[in-house]
């Protein structure tokens, strides 16, 4: 069977209506891209996945939205990330991408922690806020007085203790893994 017909059949089977006159593919090559999707093969057969180009674009847009320059107030940044990620996930929700979503989700949690860490600016503020969030004083002093960069500092035990996933979700973070599971179940 021709790969292009197979691609249309798989995408139509997953409830995406494809207008045949507008989207026609004559052949499929190794990194075949069709409406942002690609086909993969594993032991169970053929599956739909996201092409690498949209992945790069998605990550660069998230990087731009969670930039340290933009993070003056974290709430508007979280809202913009939520709007963009929700739209992207709703479009690409039929694709199999659980591992990639988990990787980007962990990276995005780290970016948000870094933005919050940068907002605190002074070591005294960092130590005080960590202690308020329930971190032991000695760990808070170590993390708050570090002279390493923002990215390194948010890898410390103290910062991860203070800003857990649950706390970030309660403050408005859009968890990509949870959203992907709820979207992907519907297909």
Regions found by a protein language model. Give the residues of each.
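Non-catalytic terminal/accessory segments
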Residues: 1-187
